Amino acid sequence: MDKRLIITIPHYNNFEGLLTSIRSIREQFEIDIVITDDGSNSKLNEKLIISSYKNQGKIFFQYLDKNYGVGIAANKCLQFVKKSSYKYMARLDAGDICYENKFMKQLNFLEANHDIKLVGTWARVLGSKRDFLFNIKHPTNYNQIKRKMY
């Protein structure tokens, strides 16, 4: 049987941000996570990461031998997902914070709208002291999205 959702997180030298992201995942269903470390200066504390994850699900770790950049690390996560049997995949950057039940809302939307294959989210950008800086609001209608792409 297919597992429902895996979250991919590329990571480089932002351990506190990674913990913040892991701790912010609060859903009512099992979610696995794959973290690809992009050659950080110090090895991840896997035990602390696992103990910080309060949701149900497994955490998998991959390590690149040097810093190749977020694109390569994200693609390494995708390679892991392709070898597995997840129905859905989500992406977080280390430091991203999730609202409670964010993924359930997105999955419910996808399952009710089979013609749609990809969803995104708006974002609130916070400063280093978690103070609000600004919103990022991506377009939500097809024609606006097309204009942004080309």
Over which residues does each language-model region extend?
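Nucleotide-sugar donor-binding/catalytic module of glycosyltransferases
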Residues: D2-Y150
